[in-house]
Amino acid sequence: MSRYRGPRLRITRRLGDLPGLTRKAAKRSYPPGQHGQARRKRSEYAIRLEEKQKLRFNYGVSERQLVRYVKKARAQEGSTGTNLLKLLESRLDNICFRLGFGPTVPGSRQLVNHGHVTVNGRVTDIASYQVKPGDVLAIREKKGSKQLAEGNLAFPGLSNIPPHLELDKAKLSAKCTGRCEREWVALEINELLVVEYYSRKV
């Protein structure tokens, strides 16, 4: 399943607020489609599927990528759900979004893919790069790169930067000092339901 490129508000109407996907708020509170306002009892499977879709769309990952992250989270010590969130939060495109370099995760991915971001002094154009504690991120010393980042920093998608990221706005750089703790994940998600969804599939 490829990455979604369709109308974003259609997704937020169905799944709720997804800060990584779009800044815009849906005007209608019910899901899209002909039967959007109908009240139907959802099955347990449908509820788990919805939570899984929230992760996919908020972090902009494909189904195949998410399966890989679930497998990796299982192999690590501790809670699989928490490990999964930490892996997704550590993606370079998401880190750039949390810092305010990009307006959304898709916008931050574009910033990374176009070579505007460096990690430890080297241009890194892989959005899925796992940012590690001690890594230093910066916007390239190019006029176009700086203008993009400065414009986005003036109107960040999220108001709070998580405490494991230290931002220097003047230098357009930041240092990762640790992993994102569960309480600093901006998405409202029940990660245990996501783990349950994949329990028989992976």
Curated annotation (Swiss-Prot):
Ranges of residues in domain S4 RNA-binding: 90-152
Statement: the UniProt record of this protein carries the keyword Ribosomal protein: yes
Top-level taxonomy: Bacteria, Bacillati, Cyanobacteriota, Cyanophyceae, Synechococcales
CDD domains: S4 (cd00165)
Stated name of the protein: Small ribosomal subunit protein uS4
Family: Belongs to the universal ribosomal protein uS4 family.
Function, in words: One of the primary rRNA binding proteins, it binds directly to 16S rRNA where it nucleates assembly of the body of the 30S subunit. With S5 and S12 plays an important role in translational accuracy.
One GO-annotated biological process of the protein: translation
Assembly notes: Part of the 30S ribosomal subunit. Contacts protein S5. The interaction surface between S4 and S5 is involved in control of translational fidelity.
Top-level lineage group: Bacteria
Gene Ontology terms for molecular function: rRNA binding; structural constituent of ribosome
A Pfam family assignment: S4
Ranges where the record places region Disordered: 15-42
Gene: rpsD
SUPFAM superfamilies: Alpha-L RNA-binding motif
NCBIfam families: PRK05327.1, rpsD_bact
Coiled-coil residue windows: none
This protein's UniProt keywords: Ribonucleoprotein, Ribosomal protein, RNA-binding, rRNA-binding
SMART domains linked to this entry: Ribosomal_S4, S4
Keyword rRNA-binding: yes
A GO CC term assigned to this protein in UniProt: small ribosomal subunit
